[in-house]
Amino acid sequence: MPRRGNIERRPIPPDARYNSVLVQKFINKVMERGKKSLAERIVYQALDLAAERLKKPQMEIFEQALRNASPSIEVRPKRVGGATYQVPVEVKSDRRYSLAMRWLLMSARARTGKPMVERLAAELIDAYNNTGTTIKRKEDVHRMAEANRAFAHYGRL
């Protein structure tokens, strides 16, 4: 870690279609091997497909799916006197959305037998409806934090 102050974060420009930084970040996460136009096509078509199936605006579906999938609390390992405790801590908003996007994408990639557009659309719909693998992952993280609630006081040292 550098000792000379904080690192300045590069601002991510919003995407062209929805003028949203969140959508742009999601496109960047979907992108593989620098193929951004392909990633954009996948994300936009998946959002269109989800909107068509749910009969709701694309951005509403995307934002609600992200909100539903984002964890509010997680566990972090903390070493105290030779023992490592899983300490529950609150998740910062940047990391919250980043985890939600990562989990959505992992769940979509884990589904098989269909094109990525359909898998991603299905995962977005599931997250929007508070079901599916992504939501299960979030609930597992919350359950883990709840189970280790006794060690929460270590987080405030």
From Swiss-Prot:
GO process terms (BP): ribosomal small subunit assembly; translation
UniProt entry tagged with the keyword Ribosomal protein: yes
Xref: InterPro entries: Ribosomal_uS7, Ribosomal_uS7_bac/org-type, Ribosomal_uS7_CS, Ribosomal_uS7_dom, Ribosomal_uS7_dom_sf
A molecular-function term among this protein's GO annotations: structural constituent of ribosome
Keyword Transferase: no
Any coiled-coil regions, as ranges: none
GO CC annotation: cytosolic small ribosomal subunit; ribosome
Key words, A-Z: Ribonucleoprotein, Ribosomal protein, RNA-binding, rRNA-binding, tRNA-binding
Subunit structure: Part of the 30S ribosomal subunit. Contacts proteins S9 and S11.
HAMAP family linked: Ribosomal_uS7_B
Family per similarity comment: Belongs to the universal ribosomal protein uS7 family.
Function statement: One of the primary rRNA binding proteins, it binds directly to 16S rRNA where it nucleates assembly of the head domain of the 30S subunit. Is located at the subunit interface close to the decoding center, probably blocks exit of the E-site tRNA.
Protein name: Small ribosomal subunit protein uS7
Provenance organism: Chloroflexus aurantiacus (strain ATCC 29366 / DSM 635 / J-10-fl)
Lineage of the species this protein comes from: Bacteria, Bacillati, Chloroflexota, Chloroflexia, Chloroflexales
Primary gene name: rpsG
